[in-house]
Curated annotation (Swiss-Prot):
Keyword Membrane carried by entry: yes
InterPro entries, A to Z: Prot_translocase_SecE_dom_sf (IPR023391), Translocase_Sec61-g (IPR008158), Translocase_SecE/Sec61-g (IPR001901)
Annotated organism of origin: Thermococcus kodakarensis (strain ATCC BAA-918 / JCM 12380 / KOD1)
Main location: membrane
Transmembrane annotation, as ranges: 38-58
UniProt GO molecular function: protein transmembrane transporter activity
Protein name: Protein translocase subunit SecE
Any one of the GO CC terms: plasma membrane
Source species, domain of life: Archaea
Similarity comment text for this entry: Belongs to the SecE/SEC61-gamma family.
Subunit structure: Component of the Sec protein translocase complex. Heterotrimer consisting of SecY (alpha), SecG (beta) and SecE (gamma) subunits. The heterotrimers can form oligomers, although 1 heterotrimer is thought to be able to translocate proteins. Interacts with the ribosome. May interact with SecDF, and other proteins may be involved.
Alphabetical list of Gene3D superfamilies matching this protein: Preprotein translocase SecE subunit
Length: 61
């Protein structure tokens, strides 16, 4: 049980250190990340749709 509590304490200490180093993104950085994510989702969806259409044309069902 002591080993478990030590692991939890260690994890919490490391998490606290990471949270202290990180910063909230600015609006410009947020918009860029949102655009990139949106483009990626559209691209993956388009590829999936193309594969689905090809599969439909090949199998006929």
């Amino acid at each position: 049980m002591a080993e478990f509590t030590e692991k939890v304490k260690s994890f919490l200490a490391e998490s606290k250190r990471v949270l202290l180093v990180t910063k909230k993104p600015g609006m410009k950085e947020f918009k860029l990340a949102a655009k990139i994510t949106g483009i990626g989702m559209i691209l993956i969806g388009t590829i999936g749709m193309i594969i689905r259409i090809i599969g439909y044309l090949v199998t006929g069902s």
